[in-house]
Regions:
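Conserved alpha/beta cores of soluble small-molecule-handling proteins
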Residues: 1-118
């Protein structure tokens, strides 16, 4: 099992690549308490043409459709999400792997209302 405290590399969070150890979420994050968030599971494989993400467009579209279903506005375009998913393998020197793009509400407020959160 991986010891995540000792892991190195980068995570894309809030629109920028941050060091693994700096990617932290507050304990009062709305999604942690109420479960309102969306995610995908995306796999990349090493091919003769380099690293390729399996059905990237389908995964990204599904993420955005899931967000739309719960009235969650994603502050990035689908194109940006696709770029970042490709880039995360490069910045971490990975040829293959699994990533979990997720969108969640932060700790700007608590309570059942989520229409005022980001």
């Amino acid at each position: 099992m991986t010891d995540f405290e000792k892991k190195d590399g980068f995570i894309w969070m809030d629109g920028e690549f941050v060091d693994w150890s700096q990617a932290k979420v507050h304990v009062l994050t709305h999604t942690l308490h109420y479960g309102l968030g969306v995610f995908e599971g995306v796999r990349a494989y090493l091919t003769d043409q380099g690293t390729k993400i399996f059905r990237l467009e389908d995964h990204t579209n599904r993420l955005f459709e899931s967000a739309d279903a719960v009235n969650m506005e994603i502050p990035f375009s689908r194109e940006k999400f696709n770029e970042v998913q490709k880039e995360i393998f490069k910045v971490n020197n990975l040829k293959e792997g699994y990533i979990r793009p997720m969108c969640f509400y932060g700790a700007q407020g608590m309570g059942l209302r989520a229409d005022n959160l980001k």
